[in-house]
């Protein structure tokens, strides 16, 4: 179904997360959702594991130094079926806005690099997990499964997709997304050091510069999508929180100013300064993708499925299975199991949400648009 709204305002968040502090992280999330709502945005995009911040310290410390930080990080990760997540969903509903949220999800005793796309009525339209954590991230997070890696969702503002970090350079994930007609893409990025910090053996790709200025626009060019590419930022105080005793403090400025927004032909439409903290805006016009798609639609006329095809397996592989009533193998949907399909309570119009009563009353009357 074609998008009902083709022209609208969207925002990408470049801000400092609430390091090791779930409650602070949630308050910051709701603040930026409210700010995007006040600005008239239909969509707001947060960075990778915005809650409770990216564990960049895992790249800097040894095993013993990491243990107290890892414990605190796990204690402040976000459970999907929690009051904290419901507050975020309610903020999306109060502002009648789509929210792409990156968070460290704790499910039983495993963490995942997760994203949700929340609708303007607070429903979770997409729940996905990074399919393979990168290098030392494997010491913190587990892998996504078959039913948690697809991302493109039809909405009334277009077909919206989301990926985390180096997933945005994964040719197979890009092929899958473009084949589903993606129009707006959220490339969630963590906090990343500038190339000046690179040591001789460290690949250049492991710095912010190529990811901000090559990977993200390449995604836009190859898929002819708008790409919102939010990064986290960090302050001197944040560096102190993320650095254990005995480890040299780094200059926080070497990690900031990496957020970008690109148009469907790869042009940079918005670029953040190092000291900028706030929302980057873009005026999206879905019709701007017509000519880039006319020249090269890799999910349509510019591909040869008779020669090259991608096999996608969206089945969840169970650790323990049980027979169902028909004698087959029982299964479940992860999004349902973790409580993200649980409906919210009725909208409130008299609470201290930060949104005016008039706006709350108006937004509460709006119908869901799942597409």
From Swiss-Prot:
Q: Does the keyword Disulfide bond apply?
A: no
The subunit field of the Swiss-Prot or TrEMBL record says:
Oligomer of dimers, forming left-handed helical fibers.
> Which residues does the UniProt record annotate as the domain CN hydrolase?
8-286
Known catalysed reaction(s)?
formamide = hydrogen cyanide + H2O
Q: Which residues form a coiled coil?
A: none
Q: Which InterPro entries match?
A: C-N_Hydrolase, C-N_Hydrolase_sf, CN_hydrolase, Nitrilase/CN_hydratase_CS, Nitrilases_CHs
Species the sequence originates in: Botryotinia fuckeliana (strain T4) (Noble rot fungus)
Q: Name one GO biological process term.
A: cyanide catabolic process
Q: What is this protein called?
A: Cyanide hydratase
Among PROSITE patterns, the record links this protein to: CN_HYDROLASE, NITRIL_CHT_1, NITRIL_CHT_2
Note down the stretches annotated as region Disordered. Answer: 326-356
Under Pfam families, the record lists: CN_hydrolase (PF00795)
What is annotated as the active site? 48, 130, 165
Q: What lineage does UniProt assign to this protein's organism?
A: Eukaryota, Fungi, Dikarya, Ascomycota, Pezizomycotina
Q: What does this protein do?
A: Catalyzes the hydration of cyanide to formamide. Degradation of cyanide may be important for plant pathogenic fungi in infection of cyanogenic plants. Can also transform some nitriles like 2-cyanopyridine and fumaronitrile and has a minor activity with 4-cyanophenyl acetonitrile (4-CPA).
One GO molecular function term of this record is: cyanide hydratase activity
Question: Belongs to which family?
Answer: Belongs to the carbon-nitrogen hydrolase superfamily. Nitrilase family.
Lyase as a keyword of this entry, yes or no, is yes
Per the entry, induction is: By cyanide.
Keyword tags: Hydrolase, Lyase
Q: What is its EC number?
A: 4.2.1.66
Question: Superkingdom of the source?
Answer: Eukaryota
